[in-house]
């Protein structure tokens, strides 16, 4: 007999008991570089279409992936090997796979600097393990080539198959090449032009913005920093490039104690995950939730015999959920319901609708 259901949500109580002493202490200070970033200083995404060769009969089935044979034919013609259209269509390349190559171009990257790339199969290749990515142009959103990638693909997974059975550990159709691309073109990044830079918080909060401004003004002098809104602040910087870099380095390492964020519960219906911060509280309420399970007979199938499938629904009794003033109380109250994570998602949404859950509910 197989029963479809989740594990009971009692692990959360253990987690809360372990981390609660940390939350009872005052909030720790964080560096400005951990809270905010300079506007315009960011990475840029690159993408390219490449070919992985050297696979051990685990490449694309070229009869089902015509773009692989077309790419190989184009590459061979550039190398002086010309094939007729009929020859190109008859290519059977079990050791070749078409792949998309992606990378992030860090800010201030200069030509000649190596960057990591990710190689992902886009056809029906079984594995990229042991393959080599041939020279691939990586382009930005503007269509310009910013890096060239090539190298051996490192795949963290492993797999084997025999006699119709197959075992796979981790993912085999994607891998990485550490330092596999070389930057060919730099992206201009203007910092401090006009004598000011703009800092942007990762999360909007008026209180934290004001604390960052106060910390900068205490160190660099009154009027150096000024809040713009709940996310941005403007900071006056030296005109000289060397002095500007030194000044920003000191500013980024200043300690600031951020204001506690809003109470929030994040749930993922696909995995049954529930995460909440320490500001979540509960008002007293009553909850009744029936448990639904599906039972499938796992016996040997016989021709002409219908499968034995049963749907069972337990009677949910009305339970009193006590008010909780801190995370430990909230977890204890929810754990008392005895609901599995999937049921808990529906309970939390109903609590929010009833006004008993004092937190923002976010579904990802």
From Swiss-Prot:
Protein known as: Flagellar P-ring protein
GO cellular component assignments: bacterial-type flagellum basal body, distal rod, P ring; outer membrane-bounded periplasmic space
Family: Belongs to the FlgI family.
Annotated signal peptide: 1-29
Taxonomic placement: Bacteria, Pseudomonadati, Pseudomonadota, Betaproteobacteria, Rhodocyclales
Entry-linked InterPro entries: Flag_FlgI
Keywords: Bacterial flagellum, Periplasm, Signal
Subunit structure: The basal body constitutes a major portion of the flagellar organelle and consists of four rings (L,P,S, and M) mounted on a central rod.
Localization (cell): Periplasm; Bacterial flagellum basal body
GO biological process entries: bacterial-type flagellum-dependent cell motility
């Amino acid at each position: 007999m197989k029963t479809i259901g989740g594990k009971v949500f009692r692990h959360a109580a253990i987690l809360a008991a372990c981390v609660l002493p940390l939350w009872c202490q005052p909030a720790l200070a964080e560096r400005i570089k951990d809270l905010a970033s300079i506007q315009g200083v960011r990475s840029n995404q690159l993408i390219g279409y490449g070919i992985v060769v050297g696979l051990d009969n685990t490449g694309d089935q070229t009869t089902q992936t015509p773009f692989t044979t077309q790419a190989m034919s184009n590459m061979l013609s550039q190398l002086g090997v010309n094939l007729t259209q009929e020859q190109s269509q008859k290519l059977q390349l079990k050791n070749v796979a078409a792949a998309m190559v992606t990378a992030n171009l860090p800010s201030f990257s200069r030509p000649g600097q190596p960057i990591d790339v990710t190689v992902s199969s886009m056809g029906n290749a079984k594995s990229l393990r042991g393959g080599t990515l041939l020279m691939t142009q990586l382009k930005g959103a503007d269509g310009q080539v910013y890096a060239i990638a090539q190298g051996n693909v490192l795949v963290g997974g492993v797999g084997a198959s025999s006699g119709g059975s197959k075992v796979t550990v981790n993912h085999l159709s994607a891998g990485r090449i550490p330092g596999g691309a070389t930057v060919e073109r730099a992206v201009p990044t203007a910092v401090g032009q006009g004598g000011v830079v703009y800092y942007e918080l990762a999360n909007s909060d008026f209180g934290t913005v004001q604390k960052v401004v106060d910390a900068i003004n205490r160190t660099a002098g009154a009027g150096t920093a000024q809040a713009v809104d709940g996310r941005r602040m403007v900071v006056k910087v030296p005109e000289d490039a060397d002095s500007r870099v030194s000044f920003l380095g000191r500013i980024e390492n200043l300690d600031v104690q951020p204001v506690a964020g809003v109470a929030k519960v994040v749930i993922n219906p696909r995995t049954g995950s529930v995460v909440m911060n320490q500001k979540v509280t509960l008002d007293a309420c009553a909850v009744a939730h029936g448990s639904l399970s599906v039972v499938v007979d796992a016996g040997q199938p016989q021709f002409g015999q219908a499968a034995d499938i049963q749907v069972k629904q337990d009677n949910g009794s009305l339970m009193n959920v006590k008010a909780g003033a801190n995370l430990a109380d909230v977890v204890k109250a929810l754990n008392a319901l005895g609901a599995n994570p999937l049921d808990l998602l529906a309970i939390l949404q109903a609590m929010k609708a009833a006004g008993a859950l004092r937190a923002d509910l976010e579904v990802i």
